[in-house]
Amino acid sequence: MSMLQTLWRSDPAVARIIDGEMRRQRDGLELIASENYASRAVMEAQGSALTNKYAEGYPGARYYGGCEWVDQVEDLARARVKELFGAEYANVQPHSGSQANMAVYFTFLRPGDKVLGMNLAHGGHLTHGSPVNFSGQLYTFVAYGIDPKTERIDYDQVAEIARRERPKMITVGASAYSRAIDFAIFRQIADEVGAFLFADIAHPAGLIAKGLLPSPIPYAHVVTSTTHKTLRGPRGGIIMMGKDFENPFGLKAAKSGRTLMMSELLDKMVIPGVQGGPLMHVIAAKAVGFGENLQPEFETYARQIIRNAQTLAGALMARGYHILSGGTDNHLMLIDLRNKGVSGKAAQEALDRAAITTNKNAVPNDDKSPLITSGIRLGTPALTTRGMKEPEMEQIAALIDDVITHINDDHTINRVREEVFALCARFPVPGLEPSA
């Protein structure tokens, strides 16, 4: 109760809901690849008095007075994230990864422009051209995918499509692709067809920041990410640039004719283009998270994420599960359950009953609807934050298999649930105090 003392007194209905969610996080295994546990320090910054402050604009150029302290925290967040990724430019104001992506699209594209992005069913993301998303509704997307045999990105296919379609932008990144991405090849393809290269690294950002996966910063014209997932910070977005800080397309100001910097274009699109006031309490939490990411122990953590994912994938494959591409280089894996005769929805719901949280996910050539799917996606960032290592991944693989193999057996699911509770008790969530 100590984390919610005031709230219990003022609004017990909301306190009870939050307490229930805290119990769920503490007592269950979190395998959703996009989720993690923010530190107590991150949560304290996000719950601070900075939530009261409006600060439209940027440090030194605000539309409101009284911004001397929030200017400092935004400058600190920008400096830290630039150091973390080796970037020359950073904007830490986007409220989410999707809004960061929106700012990029709105800056460099016009409605109807052609964009090449990864097929959602092959591991892409909603904002990479899904017809139900603004990206697919405003722009003309063509898709690249994975090779049906290797289940990895087919770079020759990407180049072939790019030459044929001549997109204005190539979007690279994924939400359910388990292999390292060769950004250098994507840049070569983009340069060949005169396209703008945009990299969305929301999922593997923490692993990229510590040099464990290739970085797009030297290759992409612009890079976006979220700040949670493998970065383990607050929910939010960022935009970064490396060597292409100067405008490579020669865009000029209408009145003065001055060549515009890409940083100017992006900053103006974030505000006033797609947002108003920044969330200064979240920016403070981002600064705290970036500070944690810069510590040596974060590299140890990031390495363990990958080892855990590879161990979990190997243990599941040994039990007959089809993991796309035959393994993982990062923090996640996509499991095609069709050889098990189980839908993604059924697996997710059964695992939920066993206190193992996953998400159903479409797989290539899926014949089921997005609300059912033929696969599930698993990730190890949250498990690794709890301190779990390879032996626990072997145990968790066995528990997952027990549930899916006996998906309609309540006795088995209840037994697994008790084992999950015992395992979680051995590895408490850092900073998440037990309820009274």
From Swiss-Prot:
<dbReference type="InterPro" id="IPR015424">
    <property type="entry name" value="PyrdxlP-dep_Trfase"/>
</dbReference>
<dbReference type="GO" id="GO:0004372">
    <property type="term" value="F:glycine hydroxymethyltransferase activity"/>
</dbReference>
<dbReference type="InterPro" id="IPR049943">
    <property type="entry name" value="Ser_HO-MeTrfase-like"/>
</dbReference>
<comment type="function">
    <text>Catalyzes the reversible interconversion of serine and glycine with tetrahydrofolate (THF) serving as the one-carbon carrier. This reaction serves as the major source of one-carbon groups required for the biosynthesis of purines, thymidylate, methionine, and other important biomolecules. Also exhibits THF-independent aldolase activity toward beta-hydroxyamino acids, producing glycine and aldehydes, via a retro-aldol mechanism.</text>
</comment>
<dbReference type="InterPro" id="IPR019798">
    <property type="entry name" value="Ser_HO-MeTrfase_PLP_BS"/>
</dbReference>
<comment type="subunit">
    <text>Homodimer.</text>
</comment>
<dbReference type="InterPro" id="IPR001085">
    <property type="entry name" value="Ser_HO-MeTrfase"/>
</dbReference>
<feature type="modified residue" description="N6-(pyridoxal phosphate)lysine">
    <location>
        <position position="229"/>
    </location>
</feature>
<keyword id="KW-0963">Cytoplasm</keyword>
<dbReference type="InterPro" id="IPR039429">
    <property type="entry name" value="SHMT-like_dom"/>
</dbReference>
<dbReference type="GO" id="GO:0035999">
    <property type="term" value="P:tetrahydrofolate interconversion"/>
</dbReference>
<protein>
    <recommendedName>
        <fullName>Serine hydroxymethyltransferase</fullName>
        <ecNumber>2.1.2.1</ecNumber>
    </recommendedName>
</protein>
<feature type="binding site">
    <location>
        <position position="120"/>
    </location>
    <ligand>
        <name>(6S)-5,6,7,8-tetrahydrofolate</name>
    </ligand>
</feature>
<dbReference type="GO" id="GO:0019264">
    <property type="term" value="P:glycine biosynthetic process from serine"/>
</dbReference>
<dbReference type="InterPro" id="IPR015422">
    <property type="entry name" value="PyrdxlP-dep_Trfase_small"/>
</dbReference>
<comment type="similarity">
    <text>Belongs to the SHMT family.</text>
</comment>
<keyword id="KW-0808">Transferase</keyword>
<feature type="binding site">
    <location>
        <begin position="124"/>
        <end position="126"/>
    </location>
    <ligand>
        <name>(6S)-5,6,7,8-tetrahydrofolate</name>
    </ligand>
</feature>
<keyword id="KW-0554">One-carbon metabolism</keyword>
<comment type="pathway">
    <text>One-carbon metabolism; tetrahydrofolate interconversion.</text>
</comment>
<feature type="site" description="Plays an important role in substrate specificity">
    <location>
        <position position="228"/>
    </location>
</feature>
<comment type="pathway">
    <text>Amino-acid biosynthesis; glycine biosynthesis; glycine from L-serine: step 1/1.</text>
</comment>
<keyword id="KW-0028">Amino-acid biosynthesis</keyword>
<dbReference type="GO" id="GO:0030170">
    <property type="term" value="F:pyridoxal phosphate binding"/>
</dbReference>
<dbReference type="GO" id="GO:0005829">
    <property type="term" value="C:cytosol"/>
</dbReference>
<dbReference type="InterPro" id="IPR015421">
    <property type="entry name" value="PyrdxlP-dep_Trfase_major"/>
</dbReference>
<dbReference type="Pfam" id="PF00464">
    <property type="entry name" value="SHMT"/>
</dbReference>
<keyword id="KW-0663">Pyridoxal phosphate</keyword>
